[in-house]
């Protein structure tokens, strides 16, 4: 609890985690306060360790406080509290027997159940997407050539206009800067600070927060400022974001877009020029999009938004403005508002 004192907006509370009534009332109060004040809480529940820390090492080999921890077993404490409040011992025993029978019955069902089919390992990696065909005007008459960074910006602007659940957040994407590449310029002014906002310099939070945002019906578009910075967020991407659909048997995919400016450009040096696609490609459960021109950027951004799965949008910095010799072909006329380019279909530009 002392740890949170350095964070002004976070409150801390310590409770006896082995005391059911104290824990219940404390958590009830915390939830009520959180909903009213919209602030985070850290609850430190002090609990005994009644079993081994790991199955590989017996606790009596490395602990001399076993008896003290056994005295803090929450179940006997709860039984005493119930008896002191007037609940008869016979009623408590009846509940215990019923719970034991329920657990025993479920255990027997598990023992008698057939072994899982290994082929199921490959099911529910992704939720089906409604976007399967290219639609709309890719090259509408009168459309001016537009650089890739602007097509990304315009795509998100249109998405936010059409979808009130769409949010955009990350490092420096808010009002004052609008992204270090101006990839979010004007969006906070148009849609407000409650939909376009800055985050702490914390990639684990930026990526991990998409799980909760998606669960409550928002569609987060988040940005990791440079591909080089994605590593602190990789744990959240790998263990939570990419696996939610599989672990829920297809019920709860994390619907989000993670924008990642990538690659060498200008004077980025070794800490702002990395290419991380080979690492990301080995994470099952995420879709990776890597546009090579501005028209694809807009069409793929629209498809990524309507895809119910997590999509990592790799945006090469060298193609953002096409200032490097040889990248001029990345500039295309801006596609129409209704243009959408499905994910998962390669564009063959050269065949040997």
Regions found by a protein language model. Give the residues of each.
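Flexible, glycine/charged-enriched surface loops at secondary-structure junctions
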Residues: 38-42, 89-93, 114-122, 166, ...
């Amino acid at each position: 609890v002392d740890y949170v004192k350095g964070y002004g907006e976070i409150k801390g509370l310590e409770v006896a985690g082995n005391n059911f009534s104290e824990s219940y009332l404390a958590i009830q109060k915390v939830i009520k306060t959180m909903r009213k004040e919209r602030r985070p809480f850290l609850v430190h529940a002090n609990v005994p360790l009644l079993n081994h820390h790991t199955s590989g090492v017996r606790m009596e080999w490395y602990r001399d406080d076993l008896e003290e921890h056994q005295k803090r077993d929450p179940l006997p404490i709860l039984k005493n509290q119930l008896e002191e409040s007037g609940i008869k011992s016979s009623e408590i025993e009846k509940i215990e027997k019923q719970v034991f029978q329920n657990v025993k019955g479920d255990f027997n069902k598990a023992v008698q159940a057939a072994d899982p089919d290994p082929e199921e390992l490959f099911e529910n990696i992704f939720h089906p997407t409604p976007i399967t065909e290219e639609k709309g005007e890719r090259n509408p008459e009168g459309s001016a050539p537009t650089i890739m960074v602007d097509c990304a910006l315009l795509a998100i602007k249109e998405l936010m206009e059409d979808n009130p659940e769409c949010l955009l957040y990350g490092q420096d994407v808010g009002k004052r800067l609008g992204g270090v590449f101006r990839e979010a310029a004007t969006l906070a002014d148009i849609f407000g600070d409650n939909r376009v906002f800055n985050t702490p310099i914390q990639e684990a939070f930026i990526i991990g927060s998409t799980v909760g945002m998606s669960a409550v019906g928002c569609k987060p578009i988040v940005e990791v400022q440079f591909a080089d910075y994605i590593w602190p967020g990789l744990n959240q991407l790998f263990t939570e974001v990419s696996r939610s659909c599989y672990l829920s048997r297809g019920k709860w995919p994390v619907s989000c877009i993670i924008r990642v400016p990538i690659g060498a450009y200008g004077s980025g040096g070794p800490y702002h020029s990395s290419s991380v696609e080979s690492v990301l490609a080995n994470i099952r459960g995420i879709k990776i999009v890597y546009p090579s021109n501005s028209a694809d950027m807009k069409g793929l951004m629209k498809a990524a938004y309507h895809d119910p799965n997590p999509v990592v949008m790799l945006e090469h910095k060298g193609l953002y403005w096409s200032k490097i010799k040889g990248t001029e072909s990345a500039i295309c006329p801006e596609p129409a508002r209704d243009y959408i380019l499905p994910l998962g279909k390669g564009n063959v530009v050269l065949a040997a």
